[in-house]
UniProtKB/Swiss-Prot annotation:
Subunit composition and interactions: Monomer.
Coiled coil: none
InterPro entries named in the record: Phosphoglycerate_kinase (IPR001576), Phosphoglycerate_kinase_CS (IPR015911), Phosphoglycerate_kinase_N (IPR015824), Phosphoglycerate_kinase_sf (IPR036043)
Keyword ATP-binding: yes
GO biological-process terms attached to the record: gluconeogenesis; glycolytic process
Protein known as: Phosphoglycerate kinase
PROSITE patterns: PGLYCERATE_KINASE (PS00111)
Cellular compartments annotated: Cytoplasm
Biological source species: Prochlorococcus marinus (strain NATL1A)
Gene3D superfamilies the record matches: Phosphoglycerate kinase, N-terminal domain
UniProt: substrate binding residues: D24, F25, N26, R40, H63, F64, G65, R66, R122, R155
EC number: 2.7.2.3
Family, similarity comment: Belongs to the phosphoglycerate kinase family.
């Protein structure tokens, strides 16, 4: 699905124009209300700076948290406006509401090259309902629409989908374009062999991804808590490990489907067990067919790491979504860290490595290897849905290229 990008609009199209840019500024805040990680703000800078270079009037729209359609003082975008001002080296004017007379007057007072940040769109109940009247009023502030919020592209909300009915052109920003290029590209035209590493604690949250990837991949590597559902489905004893009893048949069916399609489907051969779920639990290494009663698996073992590394050696594209174990606990982070290091090495050899959002991004950043990967996705749910082959409303609403 090829969409029109901001790069198709020159200064002659944008000079003096009011441009509504949907960004993803849903950043983590500390106890004092300070921003603890500004990655998402920095990710929007190429789009914002390009618009400023083309003398546009930039009106930013973003959500923060889940205020459920009413004003919540702890979810205002004040800290974001301040940080963005520092990054841009110019004052970003913030409105008190995203619509209404005050917002309109601040937008009307803009000159070319000015930036206004509209207050949290989710303070208005019409945002998540994709209310037409709200979308129309939001759109009335601008003339052109740019969506650079890949992290919210799987939502059909007023600011991601509704406004496109009232503005033209509607194009993808540079972050959105990059996300689609890598994630869509990896699925539609990968350099093969293509491997997917799927981790995380639950099969249920990754069913769609696994089903879709079995149709596209040469190899699938499974790690994280979900492996125990596969083991139990094979008739193995898993001790106190996490199992989704209602997904046993599905686990068997996924393995069977992979086999029928000639896809290499790899599960760990050994695991690190713990006697309870805590960072300082007693631990021991065990083969997967010899898991002790009363113990639970919290990481993949060293033999499994080697197995996975060998499987990945010849791959030209690797997508990773979900950790190999409870990487938040130092004792059970080895498997996840080893995979992160392996992918960094593969990247250096020319393999396209894509970290598909969520916890794997946190794991790669914790290991200090983010810069070594080909692409780190900024979307959690959006990345998953794209990998599942779903159409993202925020993307489909944009003009075709």
């Amino acid at each position: 699905m090829s969409k029109r990008s901001l790069s198709s609009l020159g200064a002659e199209d944008l000079c003096g124009k009011r441009v509504l840019v949907r960004v993803d500024f849903n950043v983590p805040l500390g106890d004092e209300g300070q921003i603890t990680d500004d990655t998402r703000i920095r990710a929007a800078l190429p789009t914002i700076n390009d618009l400023l270079d083309k003398s546009a009037r930039v009106i930013l729209s973003a959500h923060f948290g889940r205020p459920k359609g009413e004003v919540n003082e702890t979810m205002r975008l004040t800290a974001v406006a301040q940080r963005l001002s520092e990054l841009l080296g110019k004052t970003v004017v913030k409105t008190e509401s995203c619509i209404g007379a005050e917002a309109k007057s601040k937008v009307d007072a803009m000159s070319n090259g000015d930036v206004v940040l509209l207050e949290n769109v989710r303070f208005i109940s019409g945002e998540e309902k994709n209310d037409t009247e709200f979308a129309k009023e939001l759109a009335s502030l601008a003339e052109v629409y740019v969506n650079d919020a890949f992290g919210a592209a799987h939502r059909a909300h007023a600011s991601t989908e509704g406004v496109t009915k009232f503005l033209s052109p509607c194009v993808a920003g540079y972050l959105m374009e990059k996300e689609l290029k890598y994630l869509q590209g990896a699925i539609d035209q990968p350099k093969s062999p293509l491997a997917a590493i799927v981790g995380g604690s639950k099969v249920s949250s990754k069913i769609g991804v696994l089903e879709s990837l079995i149709d596209k991949c040469d190899k699938i590597i499974v790690g994280g808590g979900m492996i125990f559902t596969f083991y139990k489905a094979r008739g193995l004893s898993v001790g106190n490990s996490l199992v989704e009893e209602d997904k046993l048949e599905l686990a068997s069916a996924l393995e069977k489907k992979a086999k029928e399609k000639g896809v290499e489907f790899l599960l760990p051969t050994d695991v690190v067990l713990a006697d309870n779920f805590s960072p300082d639990a007693n631990s021991k290494l065990s083969k997967v067919d010899a898991i002790s009663e009363g113990w639970m698996g919290l990481d993949i073992g060293s033999e499994s790491v080697e197995l996975f590394q060998n499987a990945l050696k010849d791959c030209k594209t690797v997508i990773w979504n979900g950790p190999m174990g409870v990487f938040e606990f130092e004792k059970f982070a080895n498997g996840t860290n080893a995979i992160a290091n392996t992918l960094a090495e593969l990247s250096a050899q020319g393999c396209c490595t894509i970290i598909g959002g969520g916890d794997s991004v946190a794991a790669v950043e914790k290991a200090g290897l983010a810069k070594n990967m080909s692409h780190i996705s900024t979307g959690g749910g959006a990345s998953l849905e794209l990998l599942e082959g779903k159409v993202l409303p925020g993307v489909s609403a944009l003009d075709d290229a």
